[in-house]
Regions:
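FAD-binding core of flavoproteins
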Residues: 1-70, 191-200
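Structured core elements
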Residues: 5, 19-21, 102, 176, ...
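Tryptophan-centric aromatic hotspots in well-structured domains and transmembrane helices
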Residues: 20-21, 40-41, 71, 105-108, ...
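Short, well-ordered loop/turn and helix-capping segments at boundaries between secondary-structure elements
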Residues: 27-28, 49, 70, 74, ...
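Glycine-rich phosphate/cofactor-binding loops in nucleotide/flavin-utilizing enzymes
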Residues: 40-55, 146-200
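C-terminal helix-coil-helix/basic helical segment that borders enzyme active sites and/or dimer interfaces
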Residues: 73, 77-87, 101-157
Length: 200
């Protein structure tokens, strides 16, 4: 369309997003999606689903968790025995497991709500904040267990777990921005979910 332009942004996570610009764009009537002037309602509903989808990406950390547990079971610790036998490793893995399970419960709750009706914005926002921050927390814990070599890229000498933790670590950082920054979404949870006054 005339007046529409796109500028790509290549992220540290290895994916591309875009900034879009609209200047005097005229949309032909045949291309209108939904009702005229109903775009805000449409986009906010879509954003709720995007937020839930971003939270669901934290399920990818379950595979990282399983790989890390297996690695810890089969890798000798510097202090003797296996990494999995070290109390610090057990505590980190236990905490990661608890966070993953809590995220799964919240994700299932939101999926149930979506199956019954549209998801409420405050619940989608809470799910996104918890899910994306859980993803970061779990990967931090797994990197504590695996050590610095967990941050070595796939294909590089010394990469552990085929570089999966490094790859996921880069991706999980940018997920906190998609669908709205977590700081903004916390305000939405407070105002829409808890009836608190606006923070700003």
């Amino acid at each position: 369309l005339p007046g529409f332009s796109v500028t790509p942004i290549h992220t540290v996570g290895g994916v591309r997003t875009n900034v879009t610009f609209y200047e005097n764009v005229r949309v032909p009537a045949a291309m209108i999606f939904g009702e005229l002037n109903g775009g805000w309602r449409l986009i906010t509903e879509q954003l709720n689903h995007e937020r839930v989808g971003l939270a669901a990406l934290a399920y990818g950390a379950m595979g990282c968790f399983d790989q890390t547990v297996e690695w810890a079971r089969t890798t000798p610790a510097a202090e003797g025995g296996r990494v999995i036998d070290r109390p610090w490793a057990q505590l980190a893995l236990a905490e990661a497991y608890v966070v993953l399970q809590a995220n799964a419960v919240l994700g299932n709750r939101v999926a149930w709500e979506i199956s019954r009706e549209s998801v409420r914005p405050e619940l989608a926002s809470a799910c996104k904040v918890f899910g994306t921050e859980s993803y970061i927390k779990v990967l931090q814990l797994l990197l504590d267990v695996v050590g610095c070599a967990g941050l070595v890229k796939q294909g590089s000498p010394g990469a552990r777990l085929q570089g999966r933790l490094e790859r996921e670590w880069r991706m999980c950082q940018i997920n906190t921005f998609g669908g709205g920054a977590v700081e903004v979404l916390r305000d939405m949870v407070a105002t829409m979910g808890l009836g608190q006054p606006r923070g700003r």
